């Protein structure tokens, strides 16, 4: 489980969320970026946009495919990672760090209980 940090929650759509106070930091997992291949473009949502859990909010485009992004929890977008506009490869290089996608002000933290922990996500990715 080296590529599944224990301090995060995961969706079955391969997004992760790290909670810091009432802010959720969202990105895609190592597994997702590995399946996508070299990321060449990321469509980011507008700051201020209200998102619901599981709502589609953008896309990640790689040399192989285009994949929709889904929000793992409800909230208002308070920041997006503008570095991804010029350096989308950060998602491949550091998906849990510099490759984060957005920060949300969480509106319903109880929704996090619907997500997978690291062990469950790791098992999910191995089900194929």
From Swiss-Prot:
One of its GO terms (biological process) is glycine decarboxylation via glycine cleavage system. Its cofactor is (R)-lipoate. Residues 23-105 form the Lipoyl-binding domain. Binds 1 lipoyl cofactor covalently. It comes from the Bacteria. Pfam families: GCV_H. Keywords: Lipoyl. One of its GO terms (cellular component) is cytosol. The modification N6-lipoyllysine is found at residue 64. The glycine cleavage system is composed of four proteins: P, T, L and H. Belongs to the GcvH family. This is Glycine cleavage system H protein. It comes from Symbiobacterium thermophilum (strain DSM 24528 / JCM 14929 / IAM 14863 / T). The lineage of its organism: Bacteria, Bacillati, Bacillota, Clostridia, Eubacteriales.
